[in-house]
Amino acid sequence: TDRMTSTASAFVDRHVGPDTTELARILDAIGVDSLDELARKAVPESILDTVVDGVPDGLATLPPALSEHDALAALADLAGCNTVATSMIGLGYYDTLTPPVLTRGILENPAWYTAYTPYQPEISQGRLEALLNFQTMVSDLTGMDVANASMLDESTAAAESMTLMRRANRGSKSPRLVVDSDIFPQTKAVLATRAEPLGIELVYADLADGLPEGDFFGVLAQLPGASGRLVDHTATIEAAHERGALVAVGVDLLAATLVTAPGEIGADVCFGTTQRFGVPMGYGGPHAGYLAVRSGHSRQLPGRLVGVSVDADGHRAYRLALQTREQHIRREKATSNICTAQVLLAIVAAMYASYHGADGLRAIARRVNTRARTVAAGLQAAGIDVVHAEFFDTVLAAVPGAAHTVVDAAKQRGINLRPVDDDHVAIACDEATTEAHIVDVLAAFGAEPAGPGAESVPADCARTSEYLTHPAFTRYRTETAMLRYLRALSDKDIALDRSMIPLGSCTMKLNATAEMESITWPQFARQHPFAPSTDVPGLLRVIADLEQWLVDITGYDAVSLQPNAGSQGEYAGLLAIRRYHQANGDTGRTVCLIPSSAHGTNAASAVMVGMRVVVVACRPNGDVDVDDLRAKIAEHADTLAAIMITYPSTHGVYEHEISDICAAVHDAGGQVYVDGANLNALVGLARPGRFGGDVSHLNLHKTFCIPHGGGGPGVGPIGVRSHLQPYLPGHPLAPQLGDGPTVAGAPYGSASILTITWAYIAMMGAQGLRRATLTAIASANYIARRLDEYFPVLYTGDNGMVAHECILDLRGLTKDTGVTVDDVAKRLADYGFHAPTMSFPVPGTLMVEPTESENLEEIDAFCDAMISIRREIDRVGSGEWTVEDNPLRGAPHTAQCLVADWNHPYSRELAAYPAGYDRPKVWPAVRRIDGAHGDRNLVCSCPPIEAFA
């Protein structure tokens, strides 16, 4: 047989779509005899790694491939090395009780976790509605007007708040930001990292004592503070506004159910995390951060923003709003470099709020506060000083000289407390804290329970306003209702469980169940990121293995896993280059060369590290114009910091001059940043650290199988050569990482999903990884050959080959017929497919990436759909249909529109089943959405109940 079908099959045979027979057909169609010949034809000889017995250079040190069963057993052994202690450390990370219906219905459900960012809103209405619920939840609890669709974590959300206030406060020329001295230490570190390249001066102050002297553009406060203290910031906000400053407050959303919302006392910005709303700590992540603003600042928001609009029939519909703020359009002038953040976790948090409702959240908060008050009362009864009388969940105990003794005593009882210094211990209570935990905590201090103490939320700070009154937070309080709601939403969306998602530059490959299974195991999921290292030897082994494997695969000398998105990897890599130049006395090296074809994130990241972007032209064939590059290098020889170059290029080809490009930059004293977005075309073939790169970020959510989650989570680790290693990210609470800049809230970023990539590499092995890469390239070339006569392939390499993706040029057809790339994308939904990437990197084109995971049947079905669409375009071109009324312009077609009055020149059958009745399809929930209407009439929270009538 072509493929073994027993459970003993090698994992690579489960992961790679085409079997032996299908692969032979693919190779025959593209004119090569083998995958090895394909490698020699597609990849420049100068960078191609040699292969011995099927194993490429660099990958020989990878362990032999494991079966799915053995990989899970190995992970279980590592999990068994960890200790699941009771975490009472706090600092923004808390144990939480995830409702099982959400674990099974979202986190373990491929209909949710294999979806992509909702760029095609008509087939993404389910997760867009869920994200609108998230935005409404955040807006309600913070008292703000507009919230975005998630941030990467709380600390980076604080940093984005800082830069947002500086942009928005046009009346202030001051570079100073006043920061609450009671802020979380990880947030303090991220703020310092982000502030320095931008020339922002951080001034720390105890806001309970008022504001410091002098001018400043903003104030950033924490509520409650890191010490647990609750402070009424009303006077601070009033004073700041009187002095022309804006105010951002980092507020705990569970506390906000009991404490007056910052928006109600005048805050301009709120930021924080939604982790404790049902999202496990996961040794640091992933969790959904949040950012909310007053309506006047909505166009300054970073990241995605879901808004309400209408479709072609006037029905309510959801879409991503105000996209012109973002890096993929505004490039170096964008509000931020972040793309999508933490959609999957935002949906969990939103559904947690829906499941519990306002009264349920309030009851949880009161229980948490009662536990903390019981701790405080017991300590005081034993004569131990409680530093703050006003707190929500965290008690600060003064134990002169005995902090570590107390922490050790608690540890012997299975509880992790936080030693603030030698004289103080913090005890943080959460949803999972029990009365038995309180008894053990007090025993560690030599105390015992004395009943709940006095109220610790002062009456003048108590919340009186309503929140979460929308039906989205009242209808789904039973498991039956929630189960059906989750199913109804997911049925509106195309994810990988329904069809291929051929998005170029996105690498929508299989997210195997065996890779995913461990993320909910408590030995990984219930670990606090600042837990003692003795609790997590298994997790640290996973991290160490993964760092070494990625070093082997990329050819670099060291890897950091801290960046929790590709954008953050870019930032960390460029920051390493900046600090390297500074250490060498080359402070004037601030120019970053970026090809005109680059993803907008590159330019946005360069600006964030204080670099000046100089654009390098591309040739008509898509390659970097080496003559223009040399001219730009000569022009900026003394100030050149780096070049950022994606390889293979964003045009989907292997540029044969890559080694010369790297050498030219190095000769001028610059560094080479090789963007790893397209690493799925390099693994096992060539290593950026060996063909000229000094640093790269990798996208574990593309190449290494972490799912996209509808728009996050992602992991963007960076690999560096040895001279940049001293500048890899550090962390104030993880001294083993060194003193480099902190780029994320947790030392190892989104650590709990690193087990996915560990499992993928462990199960594929060296030969499997190389086979996957070459199969992805073969499939892309097959599509290019099949579709070229219908939609010209815009760019190919020297041998007429593309890399792992190809660009289909529709511009001629649009000019001749008026049918646009948007029309084709929407029409594909009628055929049951998600559209390829539209108009990137070239307007008026579609970029197709099949990955290695799709079999030939699915690839052919996609090609057949595209060919059928071309025939429809020809009917428009011939005049049979007008450009205003044809199945492409009318797409997508809903079931509702088919049963309404029909006055189109094409049949209902052609509208609904253009591919015939055999292929199952997701019916679009709405017709084509009016984007301009949504931006003109910005609504970013759940519509009022009347809108549903």
From Swiss-Prot:
Q: How does it assemble?
A: The glycine cleavage system is composed of four proteins: P, T, L and H.
Q: Which positions bear N6-(pyridoxal phosphate)lysine?
A: K702
Q: Name one GO cellular component term.
A: cytosol
Catalytic activity field: N(6)-[(R)-lipoyl]-L-lysyl-[glycine-cleavage complex H protein] + glycine + H(+) = N(6)-[(R)-S(8)-aminomethyldihydrolipoyl]-L-lysyl-[glycine-cleavage complex H protein] + CO2
The record's function comment reads: The glycine cleavage system catalyzes the degradation of glycine. The P protein binds the alpha-amino group of glycine through its pyridoxal phosphate cofactor; CO(2) is released and the remaining methylamine moiety is then transferred to the lipoamide cofactor of the H protein.
Protein name, entry field: Glycine dehydrogenase (decarboxylating)
Q: Which GO terms describe its biological process?
A: glycine decarboxylation via glycine cleavage system
Spell out the family assignment given in the record's similarity comment: Belongs to the GcvP family.
The cofactors required by this protein are: pyridoxal 5'-phosphate
Q: Does the keyword Oxidoreductase apply?
A: yes
